[in-house]
Amino acid sequence: MKQMKVFIHILVTAFILSSCSIQKRCQAPELNLPDEIIAGENDTLTIADMSWWELYSDSTLSKLIKKTLRNNRNMQAAEAHIKQMEELYRVSKASRWPTIGAQLFADHETNDYYGEKFSKSPEFSLKASLGWEIDLWGSLRWGKRKGAAEYLASVEAARAMQMTLIAETAIAYFELVALDQELEIVLQTVKTREESVNQARLRFEGGLTSETAYQQAQVELASASALIPELEQKIALKENQIAVLAGEYPSKVERGEFDLNVTWPENIPIGLPSTLLQRRPDVRQAEQQLQAAMAAVGIAYADRFPRLTISLV
């Protein structure tokens, strides 16, 4: 009975000490921002919440972006990192709870005395253990906060990569469409220059113009024709860039019919000025990394003090 009272006193004392922990919460620094920002309109909706590439009404681009987000190697690595941080966070939470262990032993002996064997009955034993670390100085709580901050930082890093991939894919696609249109213009120009060369040749042979005009038409045709290989190479490189972003081998990229007469919305929502920085995933990631660093400091400080672990076997 006395031992039980001592054990209860130890538990009560441990809980009292743990409630008087030395840990401090992280606080956001003062940024000294202006009281107001002059802006045209305030809207809680922001274009970051919209599938802005759908404004172009290009289903091919939408499919390409979805495929890129699904197959991009860096995006897959970021998603795997999120799962890793999530599991580590679960481990940090579980460390605050008691641990239960069990061991099973089996023994069987056979002795041989001058050719006569004597066997003993098998012996079995089971041992159970219970361990619990009392979080006196907040080390385990700091570990939980550190795991949560690292998990949230990995989520924001994936969001930043997703936004970057969407922007890079859309820009590369529009550049590819622009190169296609430029090549089409050059081909039409070459066709026109070929007709001009034929007309200049007929005029020269008929004595209507000098040879200089005929040679000038040939020079203009050669100049326009020289642009075709350069544009074809740029198109191939741009297709390779899009294929790499989509996690595929270099191949032909499907194009949609790009409408130059796009109907844009009258107002593109930019969101509330007070939340613009808070919505940026790189800023949010940096904030969570700061929280994780502060938690690591708390863990290191708490490790300076002795730990109390209760073990029962």
Model region roles, listed by residue range:
Residues 20-38, 66-135, 237-254, 260, ...:
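A small-residue-enriched
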Residues 2-18:
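Sec-dependent bacterial lipoprotein signal peptides
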Residues 78, 147, 154, 231, ...:
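Conserved anionic group-binding/transfer micro-motifs
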Residues 145-149, 156, 288-291, 295:
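Amphipathic alpha-helical segments that line or abut small-molecule/effector binding pockets
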Residues 136-143:
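Short, polar/flexible loop-turn hinges at active-site or ligand-entry regions and domain interfaces
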Residues 3, 149, 156-272:
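Periplasmic alpha-helical coiled-coil/stalk elements that build and connect Gram-negative outer-membrane
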